[in-house]
């Protein structure tokens, strides 16, 4: 190479690394991050909305929400607890004195 023309020649430097022929790692990372964000969004949606919606829909089918919370056991409605009248009040019973029964 002529020293006078050396200023006009640039060294040959590759502009990009050769591809390995597989899926680029940036694409794998992108899919992993988007999947993780979608999973978190679905979980928060379940916590804030879907869980209450499921309880409301099941309660409309004739089961109370208490029955749903304490399990899927059927309640025995054939022998309900009777409504008993309250015992008669005795008026003002007075101050509490320990040991007097």
From Swiss-Prot:
Main localization (coarse): host cell
GO cellular component terms given for this protein: host cell membrane; membrane
Transmembrane segments: 30-50
Stretches the record annotates as Disordered: 75-101
Alphabetic keyword roster: Host membrane, Membrane, Transmembrane, Transmembrane helix, Transport, Viral movement protein
Cell compartment(s), UniProt: Host membrane
Superkingdom of source: Viruses
GO BP terms, alphabetized: transport of virus in host, cell to cell
InterPro entries the record matches: Gemini_mov (IPR002621)
Family named by the database record: Belongs to the mastrevirus movement protein family.
Subunit organization: Interacts with the capsid protein (CP). Part of a MP-CP-viral DNA complex.
Its biological purpose: Involved in the viral transport within, and between cells.
Protein name as catalogued: Movement protein
Originating organism: Maize streak virus genotype A (isolate South Africa) (MSV)
Lineage: Viruses, Monodnaviria, Shotokuvirae, Cressdnaviricota, Repensiviricetes
């Amino acid at each position: 190479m002529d020293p006078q023309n050396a200023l006009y020649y640039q060294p040959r430097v590759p502009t990009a690394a050769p591809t390995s022929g597989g899926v680029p790692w940036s694409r794998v990372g992108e899919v992993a991050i988007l999947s993780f964000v979608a999973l978190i969004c679905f979980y928060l949606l379940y916590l804030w909305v879907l869980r209450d919606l499921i309880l409301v829909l099941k309660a409309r089918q004739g089961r109370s929400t208490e029955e749903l919370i304490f399990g899927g056991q059927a309640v025995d409605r054939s022998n309900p607890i009777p409504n008993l009248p309250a015992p008669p009040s005795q008026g003002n019973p007075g101050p509490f004195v320990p040991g007097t029964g």
